[in-house]
Every structure is written in structure tokens, then in C-alpha cells.
Amino acid sequence: MLIVDNKMFAINVGDSRCVLGQRKGGDEKKGGEKICIEMSIDQKPMRDDEKKRIQEKGGEVSEKIPGAPRVFRKNDEVPGLAVARSIGDIVAHEVGVSCEPEVFEKELDSDDHFIVIGSDGIWDAMSSCEVVGFVFQKMEENKEICSRLLAEECRNRWEVLNLFKQKYIMEINSNKDGEMKDKNAQHNNFDIDDITCIIDFINIEKEDY
């Protein structure tokens, strides 16, 4: 993300996301309509345009590895990349994964209050609009710790989801007496995806426009 003379450029490769938080109407600190604007599009392999390019280059998109759709060489188990654009993945680039960024731009004004840049661990736990609402609420209390609070909220949501997954697996692996059919099922570990976020609070004065 780059801001030059109040013009914002969001430059993205991968599945991190950049979201702008706006408030229209109300005063500077509360009220008004809260709006989220996605300043990037997640570059997932299942996106129609990304999938088409990958297939034209001899790659395929499938779920050979359980979970998210990934990019593979045909009839192969590599590279198994869960994004359609990346930097430095040589094998993936041979089968249509691109290193070319997508660029979005916007002229900032006094309605624009903050920009959130986050890894997919944020957006898999909360929607863009949920994140914007959360930040607006927390920034009224303490801007300095907003990013930490957002990361903690997302981590908590991942942990709750993993508890439900564990409970479900134990239920389907239990016999009628409550004994585990698969002794290893109760020891399944569920990952929490990378949770990284940066919040940039914008200070554009009305008299600048």
C-alpha cells in the first residue's frame, strides 16, 4: 500500500487483503454510516480469471490436499499452492501462477478513516465489513492497540472453530458406547492460519478539498 499526495495505491500479490474504512455523515468520532471498501481482490486459484490462466499454462486447480483448492502440475502433487499469484515460487510459475500484482487506486478524502492490511488468517475469521465495524468501535477506545485487539479477536474465532471441528470428529468416530473407533481422532491438531494485520489511521482534513 502506498499513499502519494492523498492518493492511495493498493498493490497486491497473493491472498492478503487491503480494506478501507469510511464513515459518511456524523461527527469525526461517532455516528454516520460506516462503509467498508475492499481495495484488493484475493487472488485465489478458484477465481475464474486466475483459474483460466493456470489451466491455459498447463496447471490444474484441485483439492488433492484437503482444505482449500490449490494449484498443481497435472498428474503431480506439486506445488500445492493455495494462491494464484506469488513471488519466488518457481515451480508454480511454470504452471500459471503469476507474480504480476493487481493495482487499485483511490483518491482519499475526509470520509476515509483507516486502512486495514491483513493476511488471510484475518479474513478467514471475519468479513471485511465485520473488520471495519470492529475497528471503528475499538478506535474510539484506543487507536494504539486496535491491531492487537483485531488479531486477538480473529485468533479467538479460529480457536472456537477448531473446538467445533474437534467435537465433530470425536462424535463421528465414537461408537454407541462412546468409545473412540479411531484412537488418533481425539489427538487431531487444527492449525490457526497466519494472523497478521496493520491498521493505518488516515488524517485527511476537510479543508484539504
Which residues make up each language-model segment?
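PP2C/PPM-type serine/threonine phosphatase catalytic core
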Residues: M1-Y209
